[in-house]
Amino acid sequence: MKFPESLKGLKILVLGGGISGNSALDFLISEEAQPILCDRNQPETISVPFFHDNIDPRSFFEISLIIKSPGILPTHPILSYAVEKKIPVFSEIDLGRFFFKGKIIGITGTDGKSTTTSLVAHLLKKDFSDLKEGGNLGIPFTSFCKEPISLAVLELSSYQLEDSSPLDLNVSVFLNLAPDHLERHETMENYFRAKLKIADLQNPNHSLIVSEKIREKILNSTSVQCKLLSFGRATTSEAILDESSSEIRTSKFIYDISRFYLPGTHNRENLAAAILASEAIGGKPESIQAQIPFFMGLPHRFQIAGEKRGISFINDSKSTNLHSMLAGMSAWKNLDRTCLILGGRPKQEDPKPLYDFLMRGIGCVVLIGEARSVWEKGIRNVIGEKLFSVENLDEAFKIFKKWNVISESPEIRKIRLSSEITISYFVFSPACVSFDQYKNFEERGNHFLSLVEDFLNNASWT
């Protein structure tokens, strides 16, 4: 499907509001199109015609094309009608791609997309001072696609890729693959295929950067026409992660990562991918190296939420599946003194890796939300009385306030649950989506931060 050369005067249906849909609306208005919004919720103020999304699709017989928001299911009746009537359907990313004149780095994967997107943008600041980052990160592509900038760094979800036409990206990054969003994609193969669309239309001048763990799967699944570069610990990788010497080696440079701020092997793998992407787009190794120590990460991704006299709280609200939580906790060295706060609405994942992880000697677990009905029995079978099951975060902090703060020294405190359990670290890494109690993971994380602040300001520290 080809995009129209001009949108002026065209009747275009935006199916689904939200961040990307509303940005597409604003862009279409600026291009003098005649957009129509169709959504389940009517905005309080709107300057274009609005229809509820249960309207008879035949009402849209004069529509030239549809811009579909990523949250809309492919089975929506309006999309079925579009297929029947051969009405072109594009994504908001397609719309931005058609009008953008610069280069694009696209980043996908099950976990680490947002961090790696921001990391790439950070590493390239010196060489591409006008670059912008966006996409699924929360800044819609159409909000800046007509600006005269040289580079866009886009986080691309499986929903966005599934909806998009071939994007012809200069550099694509496929970080990792684990079960996720199967309620939408139904099978792992469908999910993988949606992710793999990031490499569509890439030519020999372009680069596809992948984890060594999925390199063979990709080679066996598609005909790769571009340069395929891998990252990992294997000596055959184009970016070799050597954790013993705190180095990442490429054909162009040996990068010192000893001062890289983010903890965990998964974050160093993200850094290796970001370095390869930065080199592939034209970043100078010396400039990339200079930026590495100054990346502080993103909110709600293993963020220090508060510390006081040796007791620390970690906010990892962005952890929305088991794979993400386990990756983040894999390098944690203080399990026996850690209270892990889990829960929310679990995804369709095998919980056995969670139970295996907890058997390594966790201090205790606080389980909240809908996950209690799914995981409580299994967790209790593993850790027994070290599990505390409560409805929500507020109830969790009520429990924390009842536990005894003990003095190890004038400067150091710990929280004692019993003679066997003493806690120094509270890690909120839910491994679940937030929709049972919150609008999104940001709202959930901000609530956790406010509870931590209240706890640290009001707990007895004598």
From Swiss-Prot:
Record GO cellular component, one term: cytoplasm
One Gene Ontology term of the molecular function aspect: UDP-N-acetylmuramoylalanine-D-glutamate ligase activity
GO biological process entries: cell division; cell wall organization; peptidoglycan biosynthetic process; regulation of cell shape
EC number per UniProt: 6.3.2.9
Binding-site residues, ATP: 109-115
Pathway: Cell wall biogenesis; peptidoglycan biosynthesis
The reaction(s) this protein catalyses: UDP-N-acetyl-alpha-D-muramoyl-L-alanine + D-glutamate + ATP = UDP-N-acetyl-alpha-D-muramoyl-L-alanyl-D-glutamate + ADP + phosphate + H(+)
Alphabetized Pfam families for the sequence: Mur_ligase_M (PF08245), MurD-like_N (PF21799)
Organism superkingdom: Bacteria
Keywords annotated in UniProt: ATP-binding, Cell cycle, Cell division, Cell shape, Cell wall biogenesis/degradation, Cytoplasm, Ligase, Nucleotide-binding, Peptidoglycan synthesis
Record bears the keyword tRNA-binding: no
InterPro entries linked: Mur-like_cat_sf, Mur_ligase_C_dom_sf, Mur_ligase_cen, MurD
SUPFAM superfamilies: MurCD N-terminal domain, MurD-like peptide ligases, catalytic domain, MurD-like peptide ligases, peptide-binding domain
Disulfide bonds: none
Localisation: Cytoplasm
Family matches, as Gene3D superfamilies: Mur ligase, C-terminal domain, Mur-like, catalytic domain, NAD(P)-binding Rossmann-like Domain
Family of the protein in this entry: Belongs to the MurCDEF family.
Function noted in UniProt: Cell wall formation. Catalyzes the addition of glutamate to the nucleotide precursor UDP-N-acetylmuramoyl-L-alanine (UMA).
Protein name: UDP-N-acetylmuramoylalanine--D-glutamate ligase
Organism of origin: Leptospira borgpetersenii serovar Hardjo-bovis (strain JB197)
